[in-house]
């Protein structure tokens, strides 16, 4: 089953600099591949990550996200000692993706840097929630 997953750095701090991004995305890709399914596209900008994955059957989504975030936080702090206070924000967005929309979502993730020159994360995330008919309270969105 295909999923589009979005999560942010704690307090949306800009930890994921362009020079860090390829290494983090490679790490996340290997982690997903080894434990949870097939990574299709991983990308983002300095304060958040998008992943499109084809999840293995039987994998529990909350457990998967807890493991991905915990392991990648440890990896970031170990790999980049100057980021000793790196952490992911509590919570995430996870949206199912139909097969016909797979390529569109993959391209959307690929275009994140140019997309965020025009659109804030908050606006982007609210659009994703609305598009996927997820009820939310704006008070709890960063």
Where on the chain are the PLM-derived regions?
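Basic nucleic-acid-binding interfaces
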Residues: 1-142
């Amino acid at each position: 089953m295909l999923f589009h997953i979005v999560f942010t750095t704690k307090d949306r701090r800009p930890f994921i600099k362009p020079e860090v991004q390829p290494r983090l995305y490679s790490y996340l890709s290997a982690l997903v591949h080894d434990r949870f399914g097939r990574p299709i596209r991983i990308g983002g900008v300095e304060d958040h990550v998008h992943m499109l994955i084809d999840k293995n059957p039987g994998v529990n989504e909350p457990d998967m996200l807890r493991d991905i975030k915990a392991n990648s936080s440890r990896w970031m702090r170990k790999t980049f000692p100057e980021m000793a206070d790196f952490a992911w924000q509590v919570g995430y967005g996870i949206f199912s993706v139909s097969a016909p929309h797979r390529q569109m979502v993959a391209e959307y993730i690929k275009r994140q840097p140019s997309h965020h020159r025009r659109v804030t994360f908050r606006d982007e995330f609210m659009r994703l929630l609305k598009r996927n008919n997820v009820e939310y309270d704006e008070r709890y969105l960063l």
